[in-house]
């Protein structure tokens, strides 16, 4: 499911930003963001209750098709929180084969390198919800565990024919205050400015990093939302300035 959650101001030529869901499959966090000055679309996981395994590559191909149905050609930005940042990276790789769409940048919002080798049965991407029907909580928690398995099998894309889009990491400034082993996994690379990516996946996966307020699970809380909103506005504007003009490529 793709949903437009913000519209660009009249007269603006800002490129659209597509944000991918976290491991729960939901996009509710993005609704808290302040105005970003561009069209913003959020993609939720419409198959959260579906049975069977799906690779991140397969899921990303579905999302590529969704975006193409919205923007057939031109320049776009991709991003997301946690799992959403990794999905953005994979979808960007798919778009590198598309001559009609240019990805100007990838925005990873506190998306730590997915090293869950020692905690596949524990590593939840976000805390289980205490709200809503028990069946809904069960579906979400199952989806989170499936995500950990999916990331364990994921082969991080390598750009060979085209350069990787400019990729920026927004890093939460605080650790999660929890004794839960699963929750602490999001902080295992907190000392790295790229949250473990450049040390473990290659020296140029993440080009820049910016600090934001809060810990992994409080980024979108009211007290922190201005920090992440302002940083996203700054980063996405810079990405557009660095991107080649459409008519130079097409």
Curated annotation (Swiss-Prot):
Question: Which family, according to UniProt?
Answer: Belongs to the AMT4 thioesterase family.
**Which is a GO BP term held by this UniProt record?**
biosynthetic process
Pathway of action? Secondary metabolite biosynthesis
Q: What is its EC number?
A: 3.1.-.-
Instruction: Please state what the protein is called.
Output: Thioesterase FPSE_09186
Give the signal peptide, or none: none
Gene Ontology molecular function = hydrolase activity
Any coiled-coil ranges, and where? Answer: none
Q: Which UniProt keywords apply?
A: Hydrolase
* Pfam families, sorted: Thioesterase
Q: Which InterPro entries match?
A: AB_hydrolase_fold (IPR029058), Thioesterase (IPR001031)
Please describe what this protein does.
Thioesterase; part of the gene cluster that mediates the biosynthesis of the lipopeptides W493 A and B. W493 A and B consist of six amino acid residues D-allo-thr, L-Ala, D-Ala, L-Gln, D-Tyr, and L-Val/L-Ile linked to a 3-hydroxy-4-methyltetradecanoic acid polyketide chain. The biosynthesis starts with formation of the linear polyketide chain by the highly reducing polyketide synthase PKS40. The gene cluster contains a putative acyl-CoA ligase (FPSE_09184) for formation of a CoA thioester polyketide.
Q: Which SUPFAM superfamilies match?
A: alpha/beta-Hydrolases
Q: If you read the UniProt record, what top EC class would you report for this enzyme, in one word? A: hydrolase
């Amino acid at each position: 499911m793709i949903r437009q959650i913000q519209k660009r101001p009249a007269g603006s030529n800002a490129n659209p930003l597509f944000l991918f869901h976290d491991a729960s499959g939901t996009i509710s966090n993005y609704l808290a963001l302040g105005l970003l000055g561009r069209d913003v679309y959020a993609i939720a996981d419409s198959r959260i209750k579906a049975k069977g395994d799906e690779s991140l590559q397969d899921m990303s191909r579905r999302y590529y098709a969704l975006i193409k149905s919205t923007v057939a050609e031109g320049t776009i930005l991709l991003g997301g929180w946690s799992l959403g940042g990794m999905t953005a990276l994979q979808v960007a790789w798919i778009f590198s084969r598309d001559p009609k769409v240019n990805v100007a940048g990838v925005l990873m919002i506190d998306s730590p390198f997915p090293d869950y080798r020692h905690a596949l049965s524990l590593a939840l991407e976000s805390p289980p919800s205490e709200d809503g029907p028990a069946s809904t909580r069960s579906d979400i928690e199952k989806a989170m565990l499936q995500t950990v398995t999916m990331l364990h099998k994921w082969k991080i894309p390598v750009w060979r024919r085209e350069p990787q889009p400019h990729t920026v990491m927004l890093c939460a400034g605080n650790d999660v205050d929890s004794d839960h082993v699963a929750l602490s996994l999001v902080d295992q690379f907190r000392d790295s400015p790229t949250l473990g990516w450049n040390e473990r996946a290659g020296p140029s996966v993440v080009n820049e990093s910016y600090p934001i307020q809060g810990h992994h699970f409080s980024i979108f809380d009211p007290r922190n939302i201005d920090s992440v909103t302002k940083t996203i506005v700054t980063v996405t504007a810079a990405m557009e300035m660095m991107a080649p003009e459409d008519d130079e490529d097409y």
